[in-house]
């Protein structure tokens, strides 16, 4: 667990001895699959770091449709905005698989920052990366067609969750077809058509809730 926590954005650049001392103050928590960790609009004063499993972060549109912002896995942190902004949660966090995590509340984090000012710098870097990713996603929605967005999401999931399998890359995403569509920002039918086309070209192979990427180079060219 310590190795996973050391990779979390909040701890990067912090001395290992300090990390070991700080992590002892974290509260472990386990969630079943399909559990809502927190919902959009709820008050919040706690952040979470994933030890194992996957969590989807999403928002609900005025017409009731859900849009997924990102998929998070081991060493990823979520819910940190509520630590600095006392307003309601801006998104919902729901487990895709069984999840083991650790959490801390606002008072604990402020105490950490007072003792270790470098933690605040790491948090700013995490938030800056999130903002950059959001800007990139908005640009993709405007300038990139659906197949291009599907290709890009597959590569991003591969970078985060992929494992080598022979000469291919297996991506166990644990998502339904509808969730993949929500992540891409398109209809399920359009996303399925793009996936079927990629499979027909021999770039990928679809296997339940995983994808075997056999030609990442062509997929990357399609994502541009």
UniProtKB/Swiss-Prot annotation:
<feature type="binding site">
    <location>
        <begin position="89"/>
        <end position="90"/>
    </location>
    <ligand>
        <name>3',5'-cyclic AMP 1</name>
    </ligand>
</feature>
<dbReference type="Pfam" id="PF00027">
    <property type="entry name" value="cNMP_binding"/>
</dbReference>
<keyword id="KW-0116">cAMP-binding</keyword>
<keyword id="KW-0547">Nucleotide-binding</keyword>
<dbReference type="InterPro" id="IPR036388">
    <property type="entry name" value="WH-like_DNA-bd_sf"/>
</dbReference>
<dbReference type="GO" id="GO:0003700">
    <property type="term" value="F:DNA-binding transcription factor activity"/>
</dbReference>
<feature type="binding site">
    <location>
        <begin position="134"/>
        <end position="135"/>
    </location>
    <ligand>
        <name>3',5'-cyclic AMP 1</name>
    </ligand>
</feature>
<protein>
    <recommendedName>
        <fullName>CRP-like cAMP-activated global transcriptional regulator</fullName>
    </recommendedName>
</protein>
<dbReference type="GO" id="GO:0005829">
    <property type="term" value="C:cytosol"/>
</dbReference>
<dbReference type="InterPro" id="IPR014710">
    <property type="entry name" value="RmlC-like_jellyroll"/>
</dbReference>
<dbReference type="GO" id="GO:0009274">
    <property type="term" value="C:peptidoglycan-based cell wall"/>
</dbReference>
<keyword id="KW-0805">Transcription regulation</keyword>
<feature type="domain" description="HTH crp-type">
    <location>
        <begin position="144"/>
        <end position="217"/>
    </location>
</feature>
<feature type="binding site">
    <location>
        <begin position="79"/>
        <end position="82"/>
    </location>
    <ligand>
        <name>3',5'-cyclic AMP 1</name>
    </ligand>
</feature>
<comment type="subunit">
    <text>Homodimer; in the absence of cAMP the DNA-binding domains are asymmetric in one structure; upon cAMP binding the dimer becomes symmetric, preparing it to bind DNA.</text>
</comment>
<keyword id="KW-0114">cAMP</keyword>
<dbReference type="InterPro" id="IPR036390">
    <property type="entry name" value="WH_DNA-bd_sf"/>
</dbReference>
<keyword id="KW-0843">Virulence</keyword>
<dbReference type="GO" id="GO:0030552">
    <property type="term" value="F:cAMP binding"/>
</dbReference>
<dbReference type="GO" id="GO:0003677">
    <property type="term" value="F:DNA binding"/>
</dbReference>
<dbReference type="InterPro" id="IPR000595">
    <property type="entry name" value="cNMP-bd_dom"/>
</dbReference>
<dbReference type="GO" id="GO:0045893">
    <property type="term" value="P:positive regulation of DNA-templated transcription"/>
</dbReference>
<dbReference type="GO" id="GO:0006355">
    <property type="term" value="P:regulation of DNA-templated transcription"/>
</dbReference>
<comment type="function">
    <text>Global transcriptional regulator that complexes with cAMP and binds to specific DNA promoter sites, causing DNA-bending, to regulate transcription. cAMP improves binding to specific DNA sequences, probably by altering protein conformation. The CRP regulon is predicted to contain about 115 genes. Some genes are activated by CRP (rpfA, whiB1) while others are repressed (fadD10). There are 2 CRP-binding sites in the promoter of whiB1, at low concentrations of CRP with or without cAMP transcription of whiB1 is enhanced via site CRP1, then repressed as site CRP2 is filled.</text>
</comment>
<dbReference type="GO" id="GO:0005886">
    <property type="term" value="C:plasma membrane"/>
</dbReference>
<keyword id="KW-0678">Repressor</keyword>
<dbReference type="Pfam" id="PF13545">
    <property type="entry name" value="HTH_Crp_2"/>
</dbReference>
<keyword id="KW-0238">DNA-binding</keyword>
<feature type="binding site">
    <location>
        <begin position="64"/>
        <end position="70"/>
    </location>
    <ligand>
        <name>3',5'-cyclic AMP 1</name>
    </ligand>
</feature>
<dbReference type="InterPro" id="IPR012318">
    <property type="entry name" value="HTH_CRP"/>
</dbReference>
<keyword id="KW-0010">Activator</keyword>
<dbReference type="GO" id="GO:0045892">
    <property type="term" value="P:negative regulation of DNA-templated transcription"/>
</dbReference>
<feature type="binding site">
    <location>
        <begin position="142"/>
        <end position="143"/>
    </location>
    <ligand>
        <name>3',5'-cyclic AMP 2</name>
    </ligand>
</feature>
<keyword id="KW-0804">Transcription</keyword>
<feature type="DNA-binding region" description="H-T-H motif">
    <location>
        <begin position="177"/>
        <end position="196"/>
    </location>
</feature>
<dbReference type="InterPro" id="IPR050397">
    <property type="entry name" value="Env_Response_Regulators"/>
</dbReference>
<dbReference type="InterPro" id="IPR018490">
    <property type="entry name" value="cNMP-bd_dom_sf"/>
</dbReference>
<feature type="binding site">
    <location>
        <begin position="178"/>
        <end position="188"/>
    </location>
    <ligand>
        <name>3',5'-cyclic AMP 2</name>
    </ligand>
</feature>
């Amino acid at each position: 667990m310590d190795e996973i926590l050391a990779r979390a954005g909040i701890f990067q650049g912090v001395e290992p001895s300090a990390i070991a001392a700080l992590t002892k103050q974290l509260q472990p928590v386990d969630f079943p699959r399909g559990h809502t960790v927190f919902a959009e609009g709820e008050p919040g004063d706690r952040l979470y770091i994933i030890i194992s499993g996957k969590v989807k972060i999403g928002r609900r549109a005025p017409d009731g449709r859900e849009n997924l912002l990102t998929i998070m896995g081991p060493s990823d942190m979520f819910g940190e905005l509520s630590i600095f902004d006392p307003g309601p949660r801006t998104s919902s966090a729901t487990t895709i698989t069984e999840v083991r995590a650790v959490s801390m509340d606002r008072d604990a984090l402020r105490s950490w920052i007072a003792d270790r000012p470098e933690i605040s710098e790491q948090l700013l870097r995490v938030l800056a990366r999130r903002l950059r990713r959001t800007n990139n996603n908005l640009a993709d929605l405007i300038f990139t067609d659906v197949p291009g967005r599907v290709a890009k999401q597959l590569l991003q999931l591969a970078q985060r969750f992929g494992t080598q399998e022979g000469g291919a890359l297996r991506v166990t995403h644990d998502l339904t077809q509808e969730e993949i569509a929500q992540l891409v920002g398109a209809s399920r039918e359009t996303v399925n058509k793009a996936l079927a086309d990629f499979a027909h070209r021999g770039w990928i192979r679809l296997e339940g809730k995983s994808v075997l990427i056999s030609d990442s180079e062509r997929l990357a060219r399609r994502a541009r």
